[in-house]
């Protein structure tokens, strides 16, 4: 992965007429990580959607290598992997089929995508569940399937909303190792969490510090 930078300056978000946060900023370079902290309703999920390009900020600038994301939203979508707090596991597809769907969207080369899927299944302990349909999975198994998409369809920037939800300690350790390897390869991670997760050197952003009481002008 290239030596890139991802930055936000003076970001503000408005949802339903309410200013969720304002004046927010950060800067990440290759290998960097940012943990979003704050109570429910402080805007962690909204910020992740803004960073993914799924929600337009009310104010402020998002930039990749100094270039505004608004200048090339398709390029930003291609380098970003966003996982929301709801698991996007298709119930009628098997675990392997779910991952193949995402892998082929990322890489149309069937053999290469297949190898990525096999590696993702193995890494997240899903190989024995590969043929099981999504509707039969437990909450933890669905979460691991969702997280396995990160390896099946790799991208430089990972945006993760509460990735440890429904995971046991062993699965959290696997996730921590995967995050560390991604960062060591030059990738970036932004995640929200209510749980402890080991990401050495990660920055912290407390969203309640950017709450405002009045409407933006």
Swiss-Prot record:
It is found in: Cell inner membrane. Residues 6-215 form the ABC transporter domain. GO terms for cellular component: plasma membrane. Keywords: ATP-binding, Cell inner membrane, Cell membrane, Cytochrome c-type biogenesis, Membrane, Nucleotide-binding, Translocase, Transport. Its EC number is 7.6.2.5. It catalyses: heme b(in) + ATP + H2O = heme b(out) + ADP + phosphate + H(+). SUPFAM superfamilies: P-loop containing nucleoside triphosphate hydrolases. InterPro entries: AAA+_ATPase (IPR003593), ABC_transporter-like_ATP-bd (IPR003439), ABC_transptr_haem_export_CcmA (IPR005895), P-loop_NTPase (IPR027417). PROSITE patterns: ABC_TRANSPORTER_2, CCMA. It is an enzyme of class 7 (translocase). SMART domains: AAA. The keyword Cell membrane applies. Belongs to the ABC transporter superfamily. CcmA exporter (TC 3.A.1.107) family. This is Cytochrome c biogenesis ATP-binding export protein CcmA. The gene is ccmA.
């Amino acid at each position: 992965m290239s030596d890139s930078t991802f930055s936000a300056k003076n970001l503000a978000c408005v949802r339903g007429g309410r200013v969720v946060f304002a004046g927010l900023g950060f800067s990440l370079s290759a290998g960097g990580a940012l943990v979003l902290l704050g109570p429910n309703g402080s805007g962690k999920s909204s910020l992740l959607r803004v960073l993914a390009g799924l929600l337009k900020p009310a104010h402020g600038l998002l930039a990749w290598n100094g270039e505004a994301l608004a200048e090339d939203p398709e390029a930003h979508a291609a380098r970003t992997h966003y996982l929301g707090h709801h698991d996007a596991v298709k119930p009628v597809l098997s675990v392997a089929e779910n991952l193949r769907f995402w892998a082929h969207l990322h890489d149309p080369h069937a053999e290469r995508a297949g190898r990525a899927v096999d590696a993702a299944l193995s890494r997240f302990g899903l190989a024995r569940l590969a043929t099981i349909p999504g509707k039969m999975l437990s909450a933890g198994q669905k979460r691991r399937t969702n997280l396995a998409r990160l390896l099946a369809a790799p991208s430089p920037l990972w945006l993760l909303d509460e990735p440890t939800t429904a995971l046991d300690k062993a699965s959290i350790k696997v996730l921590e190792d995967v995050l560390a390897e991604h960062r060591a390869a030059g990738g970036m991670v932004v995640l929200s969490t209510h749980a402890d997760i080991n990401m050495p050197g990660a920055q912290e952003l407390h969203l309640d510090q950017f709450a405002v009481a009045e409407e933006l002008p």
